[in-house]
Regions:
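An aromatic- and glycine-enriched ligand-binding surface/loop that stacks and positions planar moieties
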Residues: 1-5, 109, 117-120, 134-212
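Conserved, well-structured interaction surfaces
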Residues: 5-81, 97, 103-110, 116-129
């Protein structure tokens, strides 16, 4: 049964006031969800190189996508929490995972930058049809520009952003509001866009109908 009622937005108010207790579900969802994604990416990076039946093109695409997503999840984590445990291989047990200490922010950013650089060198320029929504070379470079900007490295942020602009694949809508029209999904401003389908559930936080 779905609860159609409202709420007082207490969790959002805590974020707005920069007074966030450990029990705030928005932070715990970000932490847990990111590490689920990181774990999946690490499994791909560990297992895919050994799959002999896979073509080299698909193998490289899978590895590039895994590095892109791992970087994206760590970028979300490091901005929210600062120092976080850095896992680049699957732990052998829950106990091993729990014992991994927090890694300094600078090292986490180094891994993010390396992953995005590797992904940009591997991924295709674009995808269509059933592959629409996969991470592309330009999504990786665009995210890398944002990472450099967050670090305050303006020259490298500008350099990477100019690469995306110079590709000629993206441009701005004359009306910013056009970004949010259903007809313009995966439009000319979109570097990376999560694909959804209707009808799986109506719960707004977990279990969304993601096609991936």
């Amino acid at each position: 049964m779905r609860d159609a009622g409202g709420g007082d937005g207490a969790e959002e108010q805590q974020l707005d006031n920069f007074n966030i207790p450990p029990s705030n579900p928005m932070t715990t969802r970000l932490w847990a969800g990111s590490y689920v994604g990181i774990g999946a990416a690490n499994l791909v990076l560990q297992k895919v190189p050994g799959i002999s039946s896979m073509s080299e093109a698909v193998r490289q695409r899978c590895l590039g996508e895994a590095k892109f997503l791992r970087a994206k999840y760590y970028f979300d984590l490091v901005r929210a929490f600062g120092d976080v445990p850095l896992l680049t291989t699957p732990p052998a047990s829950p106990a091993e995972a729990a014992a991994i200490p927090r890694t300094p922010t600078t090292q986490v950013y180094d891994q993010i930058i390396q992953d995005l650089t590797d992904a940009a060198a591997t991924l295709n320029d674009s995808y269509g049809g059933g592959d629409l929504g996969r991470a592309t070379k330009w999504a990786a470079i665009g995210l890398l520009a944002k990472v450099y900007l967050t670090q305050g490295n303006l020259p490298l942020a500008a350099q990477r952003a100019r690469e995306v602009i110079a590709s000629g694949r993206y441009s701005l809508w004359a009306d910013y509001g056009d970004n949010f029209k259903v007809a313009n999904e995966n439009g000319k401003e979109s570097l990376f866009e999560v694909q959804y389908i209707n009808g799986l559930n109506e719960y707004i936080f977990d279990g969304l109908g993601f096609v991936g």
